[in-house]
Amino acid sequence: MSKIRLDQYLCQNGLVQSRERAKALIMSGIVFVNEQKVDKAGEMIAPDAKVEVRGHDIGYVSRGGLKLEKAMQVFPMRPDGKVCMDIGASTGGFTDCMLQNGAVKVYAVDVGYGQLAWSLRTDARVINMERTNIRNVKPEDLAEPVAFFSVDVSFISLKHIFPVADAICTPDAVGVCLVKPQFEAGREKVGKKGVVRDPATHREVLKTAEGYAMANHFTPAGLDFSPIKGPEGNIEYLMYVQHCDTPQPLPEDLIEKVVAASHDTLDKAPNLH
């Protein structure tokens, strides 16, 4: 097998979104090949080498920022000058990415407690709404409506998120939602360790999520796969939505194409630690 540049490997396997990002990670000393640290982007490695990105020196407080980074690269969405909401904030990777890209305020909502990074807790632009179930959030709980939002939640379906987003968002709001097959598919379709591998189930879940969006005045205007897999190796999807009066479905056959591309790219890709 012919060898490949390390920075190129990281891009091709969905660990980063650009060669520039790959080079930065490699030079920072957190990329390991077969358990050995490699700090040269041009290092030639075997395609079947064990490659790991260790630590959190990825430009954001958590890898969630990489998901929103990709969404902003492939969809026409920007948080510049907008009031935003990070639904399922956890450590705050999405919040961090929003702030780095010009958000004027971010409501960081999470049912958990004590997870948000200290740098974000102490940022005047961040409204820390921890211990808050998004299903209970009402327009009167916010100082103003939300124009840009992200959703990255676990153990809850998007079915319960879109009605809230419909109520709290501006008429022209945009958002990106992580569609996670492991939390949307029926229990009988979820495999060992909560992993859903069947492309047919992925297509079914995305079609259902599309319906949830449209039923709550959101047009699913774009679809791609997350650049990194979930903790147990689940492939997850980025659905770009636009708030509107007359929702339209995704272009025909887009779901099938994106699911196929996601498996081609990520089935054998290492996880980002």
Predicted regions and their residues:
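A basic, amphipathic helix-loop patch mediating RNA/tRNA/ribosome contacts
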Residues: 1-49, 83-84
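Conserved class I S-adenosyl-L-methionine
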Residues: 80-90
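Glycine-rich SAM-binding Motif I of class I
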Residues: 92-93, 114
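Conserved S-adenosyl-L-methionine
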Residues: 97-105
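S-adenosyl-L-methionine
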Residues: 107-160
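A short glycine-rich, Lys/Arg-flanked "PGG" loop and its adjoining helix->strand segment in the class I
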Residues: 159-176
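Short, glycine-/aromatic-enriched active-site segment of Class I SAM-dependent methyltransferases
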Residues: 181-198
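Flexible, glycine-/basic-rich loop-and-beta segments that form/coincide
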Residues: 235-273
